[in-house]
Amino acid sequence: MKCFVGYVTKTGTTMEIAQRVGEALAARGIEADVAAITVDRDLRAYDRLVFGCPINGMKVLPDFATYLGGYAAKAGRPVDLFIVSYMFENGRSMWKKAIRGEAERVKALAGARTAEIFAGRIAGSLPGFARFIFGVPKDLPADIRDWEKIERWANGLADSMLA
């Protein structure tokens, strides 16, 4: 079984999550290639495709959506997605709803089996006005990734690949 774990990243957070997913798959005996997504990669060389992208402004990056619709959906391989959002776990319900909606939109665009949302990391603390708008607690750490959740999800992918 061969899997491509592709990602788009702005700060390295999504790349680090993709690497952890790839490591978890490899530990289960699945050959996992982890790399930034590019249009010149032949996705048909893989049995399974996993793609990740951060949320920015309650949307995935435009190039990611274009890639999913133009390449991933046409590869004829099972697809799973992960979305990274610092706001999702601790923000206001209206932002959670918007992020959930975006995850469902790109899931449909790619014809994906799953679209998981993971907590992310920011480069520093949020300004007070941003904490207020998004409903994020003042003392929230800059890195709130839940590595156990990420590994559970990756192991679930491995289970489905090996079944």
Question: Whereabouts are the PLM-identified features?
Answer:
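Extreme N-terminal starter segment of soluble prokaryotic enzymes
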Residues: 1-4
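N-terminal Rossmann-fold cofactor-binding loop
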Residues: 7, 37
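Short amphipathic alpha-helix with an adjacent loop that forms part of the alpha/beta core around
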Residues: 38-44
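Short polar catalytic/cofactor-binding loops
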Residues: 8-12
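FMN-binding flavodoxin-like domain, especially the glycine-rich phosphate-binding loop
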Residues: 13-16, 24, 28-33, 45-163
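Hydrophobic ligand-binding cavity/cleft-lining segments
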Residues: 20
